[in-house]
């Protein structure tokens, strides 16, 4: 069953290269497919840093996360924790 969650971007600079790389590295530790969607409906696969940067997500905006696969719950929980931590930037 696919997992869905919405999370706020907390870090001051939003989704730029450093958080995108952290998310990329995290997602690649799981087998599930992870898709991100911004408030405009633009989608990005989380295994592509360039695609995530195209979401143009700033502090205070929301991202919808979809994880599908054998470890989807673990993947989405870890991704939410990373977003909640502000990508350890602040």
UniProtKB/Swiss-Prot annotation:
It is found in: Cytoplasm. Belongs to the HPr family. The active site is at 16 (pros-phosphohistidine intermediate). GO terms for biological process: phosphoenolpyruvate-dependent sugar phosphotransferase system. InterPro entries: HPr, HPr-like, HPr-like_sf, PTS_HPr_His_P_site, PTS_HPr_Ser_P_site. Residues 2-90 form the HPr domain. Gene3D superfamilies: HPr-like. It comes from the Bacteria. Disulfide bonds: none annotated. Component of the phosphoenolpyruvate-dependent nitrogen-metabolic phosphotransferase system (nitrogen-metabolic PTS), that seems to be involved in regulating nitrogen metabolism. The phosphoryl group from phosphoenolpyruvate (PEP) is transferred to the phosphoryl carrier protein NPr by enzyme I-Ntr. Phospho-NPr then transfers it to EIIA-Ntr. Could function in the transcriptional regulation of sigma-54 dependent operons in conjunction with the NPr (PtsO) and EIIA-Ntr (PtsN) proteins. PROSITE patterns: PTS_HPR_DOM (PS51350), PTS_HPR_HIS (PS00369), PTS_HPR_SER (PS00589). GO terms for cellular component: cytoplasm. Keywords: Cytoplasm, Phosphotransferase system. Pfam families: PTS-HPr. This is Phosphocarrier protein NPr.
């Amino acid at each position: 069953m696919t997992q869905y969650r919405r999370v706020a971007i907390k870090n001051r600079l939003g989704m730029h290269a450093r958080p995108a790389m952290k998310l990329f590295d995290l997602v690649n530790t799981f087998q599930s497919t992870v898709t991100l969607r911004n408030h405009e409906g633009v989608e990005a696969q989380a295994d592509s840093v360039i695609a995530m940067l195209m979401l143009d997500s700033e502090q205070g905006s929301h991202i919808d996360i979809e994880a599908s696969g054998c470890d989807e719950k673990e993947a989405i929980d870890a991704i939410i924790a990373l977003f909640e931590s502000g990508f350890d930037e602040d």
